[in-house]
Regions:
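N-terminal lobe of the biotin/lipoate ligase/transferase fold
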Residues: 1-130, 148-157, 161
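A cytosolic small-molecule/anion-sensing beta-strand core signal
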Residues: 140
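FAD-binding subdomain of flavoenzyme oxidoreductases
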Residues: 137
Length: 166
């Protein structure tokens, strides 16, 4: 992920070659669906797209038509958003970009919704640490960090936002 400049591209001075040799194979949508969607599970559907502006924006626009637990995954994000509406871009296959639709309704009081970012961050940090065997940390309020060569680097972020839908 790189912060975008005013033109929406990579920041000035960013090394273009840094992102030019990403060799991760494309995501296997069918395998993700088999692994994540099942009776009694948390996720109702998984959709993988090659590119999008923002998975959050796309999922929010369709929230009224989708069931709770819908997951949208993108190989590339061109208009990612973070806290305080900060924008960033992420070239194809440079990371994992996804959004999950939750519909807590009356089962979770609204005053508790603010905990979602922290809870998701703890879960993500634990998952990355266990799966990759790396030290992870959370930087308040929503950044996921890993240690690389003695330096903490941002490896992800959590953005939870309420959406009105009918």
């Amino acid at each position: 992920m790189t912060p975008s400049d005013a033109s929406g591209g990579a920041p000035s001075g960013a090394a273009a070659g840094r992102w030019s040799s990403l060799d991760r194979p494309p995501l296997n949508a069918a395998a993700l669906e088999r692994a994540l969607v099942g009776d009694g599970g948390l996720w109702s559907s998984v959709e993988v797209v090659a590119a999008t502006g923002s998975t959050n924006t796309d999922l929010a626009a369709r929230a009224g038509q989708l069931p709770e637990g819908a997951v949208l995954v993108a190989e590339e994000q061109t208009a990612g958003r973070g806290r305080l509406d900060r924008s960033w871009v992420a070239p194809a296959r440079s990371g994992l970009f996804f959004s999950v639709l939750l519909k807590p309704g009356d089962s979770v009081p609204q005053e508790r919704w603010g905990w979602l970012t922290l809870l998701a961050g703890v879960a993500a940090a634990t998952g990355v640490s266990r799966a990759a065997g790396v030290d992870t940390a959370l930087k308040w309020p929503n950044d996921l960090l890993i240690t690389v060569e003695g330096e903490e680097r941002k490896t992800g972020g959590i953005l939870a936002e309420p959406v009105s839908y009918t």
